[in-house]
Design a protein with these regions (language model features):
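Noncatalytic, solvent-exposed loop/strand surfaces
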Residues: 22-458
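Extracellular glycan-recognition surfaces and repeat-rich motifs
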Residues: 48, 551-579, 583-587
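Short S/T/G/P-enriched beta-strand
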Residues: 437-473, 477-481, 531-541
């Protein structure tokens, strides 16, 4: 019917049972079951910023939901101003609000502006006490309970994760031993196609366990929270993505199960599930209607691409594209973009009632103790008592003033009898000053069955970068048709594809004379196979003039180059071209061609600009997360680690003539005092290299490592040739 409106994965067990000390934690954005529901009781019905039921307030704002774990509150936000601005994770005592520690980390090689830093929420791992964060620039970090770095990955350099002006970043989640994130990536080889890609990492080591790209062409970056549910024995991760599709994949393997296309734009709201009914929402263009926005219920037990017969009901014209819904028995509540909250029947989609809360809405409501806790972007925080016939406002408080409100963009967290939430100015804790454990944990999976037939072979780590002569150890896990772990397999048959070296019993030894190469390590168990991809980079120096490559191809090991750069014949030789074709997601691009742990090196390249409709493109070289860029239209030479934050950019005029080759040179050096020096020069090809550096920056918050690369912004085509990368002398 249609209405219209104007696992814990180890060898021995799959998921660990939650202990009572863990049971009151709110360790992820959407809570213990990732559905915005808390089972706690005796929660506050009113409070006041002036003091009533205010346990504490801390002067730290944010735009993402705080999490609570082991009596600590963790918040991700921005720190510092201007050239010293960074992203950070903060830890507070949950009883007092005392700041315990903070860890700051750099933003680099990203188009995200400063005011959108701290978009994602951190996630806590109840088994280890560790905390994980995905920054707006693509840095993925694992921190101990005390804020010490365990491991760090650069997803932009390693996988081509796209970060844009919108800042939208998906919050990570934990499932057993896996840390799972997603986003738009343009990687290399088998993963080069631009897509919304799900990626799982070993939470203890940071090794890549699986990658999955079940969708089509992405429209824009998104931040929809995933939910993991058991549907007829299959543990599904369900999430809206950047291709306008809601995808259901097996949580422990990434194998696609079903998908449903609902929009011509990316999806930012979370899915909620009641039995085998999944409720999906958005506020953008529809596929089957000219109206904007919809709510739709689909059969979550279906397989493949969902069709009309898999749709239980749909409501067109409801524009709830930021706030996620929450289920309350046989009804659910949802807030549209204009801060109108409505109740709908789960079974039919019939709207039961509607109430206005403000004018702008981003935060998702939390259902706890029969009440809804939610803030609005207008600075009002509500405690509501919903029913089948309407909603009672138990309490509403204005934070800041109506003229100058404290904006509330993030959702609340419920833990130990208290409500935690953040505005753009403060972190609040309301409720009892002393806590009590009353919540329950999510459902627990049973033990694996080692005798079930295997339908999926998982080779891990599934992505590695090595040097010639290196040795790597791979392992194999088997899963059944439901995506459940069976056992770790020691008797797989191993083989190599396009790699020089040897492999036996899971141990791969790269040929010492193999040079630059890429391929896969394959494991077969019975008639089922799986593989891991490997890139092998020889020691510096490197040179590349593209002459050995076929025209209309992409350098095979380059990250974030497909559909953005292409090899072309030009004046009797080969060059690399930053093309102008494609969407806005393709026009600006940073391509990487080496490991992200390189340091103390120099990058050189020839560049040449063209003009089109009186526009001239931009070109740059990248070393250790610094970019030396010539801007065509503005005729400037810039040295910058994070282009939108202009206080750290060094700039000088530079006359860049079109249709003329220039040589660019960027050197980055880690200094003994802990700072980093980046310096560059540019000169016309055929002229002598200038003795002096033209531009320099000493960075007080240095990037101490990073991949070599190039940058192109194709207002008109930009050419590259004769690349060199070598260690500093």
């Amino acid at each position: 019917m249609t209405y219209r409106i104007s696992q814990f994965l180890t060898i021995s067990v799959f998921l660990a049972v939650l202990s009572p000390s863990m049971a009151s934690d709110w360790s992820e954005w959407r809570g213990p079951a990732r559905d915005g529901i808390s089972l706690e009781k005796d929660l506050p019905v009113k409070w006041s910023p002036a003091g009533e039921n205010l346990a504490w307030k801390a002067p730290y704002g944010g735009r993402s939901t705080p999490i609570v774990m082991n009596n600590r509150v963790f918040l991700q936000n921005t720190a510092g101003k201007g050239e010293l601005e960074q992203e950070r994770v903060m830890a507070f005592d949950a009883d007092t609000g005392k700041l315990l520690w903070e860890h700051r980390f750099n933003i680099f090689l990203s188009d995200v502006p400063p005011h959108r830093v701290g978009w994602a929420s951190p996630v806590g791992d109840q088994a280890t006490g560790n905390v994980y964060a995905l920054g707006v620039g693509g840095s993925l970090l694992a921190l101990t309970r005390e804020g010490k770095v365990i491991w760090e990955r650069s997803l932009g350099e390693d996988f081509g994760l796209l970060t844009t002006h919108g800042g939208r970043t998906v919050s990570p989640i934990i499932d057993g031993d896996l840390l799972i994130i997603s986003g738009i990536t343009f990687a290399w080889g088998p993963h080069a196609r631009g897509a919304h890609r799900f990626m799982a990492f070993d939470k203890r080591t940071g090794e890549t366990i699986w990658q999955s790209a079940p969708g089509g062409r992405p429209y824009d970056t998104t931040y929809a929270p995933p939910i993991i549910v058991n549907i007829n024995g299959t543990r599904l991760l369900i999430q809206g993505a950047s291709d306008g599709v809601v995808h259901a994949i097996k949580a422990q393997t990434g194998e696609p199960v079903w998908k449903y296309e609902i929009s011509k734009r990316g999806i930012n709201t979370g899915v909620v599930v009641h039995g085998t009914t999944a409720i999906l929402t958005h506020s953008e263009e529809n596929i089957a209607s000219s109206e904007m926005g919809m709510v739709v219920a689909v059969d979550a037990s279906a397989k493949g691409e969902l069709k009309k017969e898999n749709v239980k009901w749909s409501v067109y014209g409801w524009q709830g594209g930021f706030s996620s819904p929450v289920i309350d028995g046989d009804r659910f509540y949802h807030i549209d973009n204009g801060a109108n909250i409505a109740a709908f029947e789960v079974a039919t989609g019939k709207r039961l009632w509607l109430e206005n809360l403000g004018t702008i809405q981003r935060a998702s409501p939390v259902l706890a103790d029969g009440k809804l806790y939610v803030g609005t972007e207008n600075g009002k925080f509500y405690i509501l008592k919903p029913s089948a016939t309407g909603v009672e406002v138990l309490d509403q408080d204005q934070l800041g003033t109506e003229a100058d409100p404290e904006e509330i963009i993030a959702s609340a967290a419920v833990s130990n009898g208290r409500i935690y939430f953040v505005s753009d100015a403060n972190l609040y804790c309301i409720g009892k000053k002393t806590s009590g454990v009353t919540n329950q944990g999510p459902p627990v999976e049973g033990l694996p069955n080692p005798n079930r037939p295997a339908t999926h072979v998982q080779v891990f780590p599934t992505e590695l970068m090595l040097k010639p002569g290196d040795t790597a150890r791979f392992r194999v896990r088997l899963f059944d048709e439901y995506g459940k772990f069976i056992r770790e397999e020691a008797n797989a048959t191993w083989s190599l594809d396009a790699l020089k070296g040897t492999v036996a019993n899971g141990q791969f030894v790269a040929a010492s004379d193999g040079g630059l190469q890429a391929g896969s390590v394959k494991a077969t168990v019975g008639n089922v196979s799986g593989a891991a991809t490997v890139r092998i980079y020889p020691p510096l120096p490197w040179t590349e003039n593209f002459d050995a490559m076929a025209a209309n191809t992409v350098p095979p090991l380059w990250v974030n180059a497909t559909l953005k750069f292409i090899v072309r014949d030009f004046e009797g030789s080969k060059i690399l071209v930053k093309t102008t074709e494609g969407s806005s997601l393709l026009s600006r691009a940073r391509a990487y061609f080496g490991p992200s742990d390189f340091s103390n090196y120099t990058v050189e390249a020839d560049v040449r600009a063209t003009t089109k409709r009186r526009q001239q493109g931009d070109a740059g070289v990248i070393a250790q997360r610094y970019v030396l860029t010539i801007y065509g239209n503005s005729q400037l030479l810039n040295l910058e680690p994070w282009q939108p934050e202009t206080a750290r950019t060094v700039s000088k005029p530079f006359a860049w003539k079109p249709d003329t080759w220039y040589r660019m040179k960027l050197q980055v050096e880690n200094l003994p005092d802990g700072k980093t020096r980046a310096r560059g020069k540019v000169w016309a090809v055929g002229e002598a290299e200038p003795a002096a550096w033209m531009i320099e920056r000493i960075d007080p918050i240095p990037n101490r490592q990073g991949a070599p690369g190039i940058f192109g912004n194709a207002l008109a085509e930009v050419f590259f040739d004769n690349l060199k990368v070598y260690a500093n002398k």
